[in-house]
Every structure is written in structure tokens, then in C-alpha cells.
């Protein structure tokens, strides 16, 4: 994939080149999107809209840290959806990891979470954020133990993983495909910014329906699909149950009991 690759820290140019090689990124000087390695972090910028600011993964501070400390623990909807309230601590594969926020919440509650992000730029951002989180004095130890990013950023990532001899099937597959956002629905400024940038970078998630069948084959216990409250079921398949929040819905497809 082509994108502008820029290093603001001369000492990190070789790191940027390694990132580009790992995720298959090629430098395009004129690209509207830039992946920028600063002294602190890897960022995505939309060069024709500088007011949008930079997008980067922060698992240590800000909203993510607040949610970890005050988000409701195992009583929150996402925890119930993956079965944490049943006394189990499932192994979860997050098939649409994005910026890693939901995966981080599940890991903070004790789950081992394998993350798959198919878009190489988003995967590179997540990889950088994960590396920084592992260095943090407060959360680094358990982040390193419980969170991993699988290098599988192609459309058929789930099928590829199942074909690997050493792949251990997860108890739960978690999916949160990007969904078109109606104009009249309110979102926070941060989420609006990210959605705008991501939808113009990644494009519409037109093949999201195709994720459900391989997810159901992969998960030994259940598949959880996060949807906006106004969205139809993924692949038009009715879930076993749904857990509703103010703005979202967790559709749960049960393969087996959590015990």
C-alpha cells in the first residue's frame, strides 16, 4: 500500500523503514495520508485537513485509562457479551481490532486477546501503541502477557489463521466491523474525527458480512458482534441473544456453553 512515510526524529528513520517493510507500505510523497514517526509515537495524518490532528493508539492514558479504572469492570456490556460474567476468562480473538480499545478493555479484565487488523496502516498504528503500552510501569506486564497482534492484515485473515497447524482456536471471536454512520446520530468529536479519517483511508467495510461464517467456525464458544443500535444483524443472521446499550448492541452467537 502507498502512503507518505515521514520521520520527524532523524534517529528513528531506520525504525520507520522497518515498519514500512513489516506492513508492506511504500512511500508516496504526494499521498494525502501520511504515516509519521515522531519522537514519541507513530501517527496517521490527513495532510489536506491538518485541523483534524493526528490519530495514534494510546492504551496508557486518556479515555482508555479512564474506562479501565471506572468503566464498570465485569459488569459492563462487552464483558457480559464475551461471557466474563459466567466466571470464565475466555481467550478472545478480536477480528477487527482497529485502534485496540475494546481488546484492551477485555485484556484489562483478564482475557487473553489476540488481535487481527487487516488494514496495514491501522495495524502499524496498533503495533506501535501496543509496544508503548508494554513499556508502561503500571500496565506493561499484563499487556505483554494478555495482548498480541497477529500479522494478518488481508481480507481472508480468519481463514488463513485456521489453516495454520499451530493456531489455537479462541473461545470467543469478537467482531466490530465499520458501519456507515447516519448524519443525524451524535458522536464524540474524537470518534467523529477517527471515523472520517478511517473511512476515507480504509473505505467502506463492504465485505463485513463475510466475516461471520469463518468466525463461527473458529470460535469454540461464541461469536460476539458489536453493532450500532440501528444496524441490521451481520449477514442477516439472527443472534442467540443480544445485549443492548444506549448506542450499541452486542449480538451473541452461541456455539457452546462458556463452562
UniProtKB/Swiss-Prot annotation:
Chief location bin: cytoplasm
Catalytic activity: guanosine(1516) in 16S rRNA + S-adenosyl-L-methionine = N(2)-methylguanosine(1516) in 16S rRNA + S-adenosyl-L-homocysteine + H(+)
GO cellular component, one term: cytoplasm
InterPro entries reported for this sequence: 16SrRNA_methylTrfase_J, SAM-dependent_MTases_sf
Pfam families the UniProt entry points to: SAM_MT (PF04445)
Alphabetized UniProt keyword annotations: Cytoplasm, Methyltransferase, rRNA processing, S-adenosyl-L-methionine, Transferase
Record-level Gene Ontology MF annotations: rRNA (guanine-N2-)-methyltransferase activity
Catalytic activity, EC: 2.1.1.242
Annotated compartments: Cytoplasm
Domain of life: Bacteria
UniProt function note: Specifically methylates the guanosine in position 1516 of 16S rRNA.
Matches recorded under PANTHER family: RIBOSOMAL RNA SMALL SUBUNIT METHYLTRANSFERASE J
Family, per entry: Belongs to the methyltransferase superfamily. RsmJ family.
Protein name (record): Ribosomal RNA small subunit methyltransferase J
Biological source species: Aliivibrio fischeri (strain MJ11)
Taxonomic classification: Bacteria, Pseudomonadati, Pseudomonadota, Gammaproteobacteria, Vibrionales
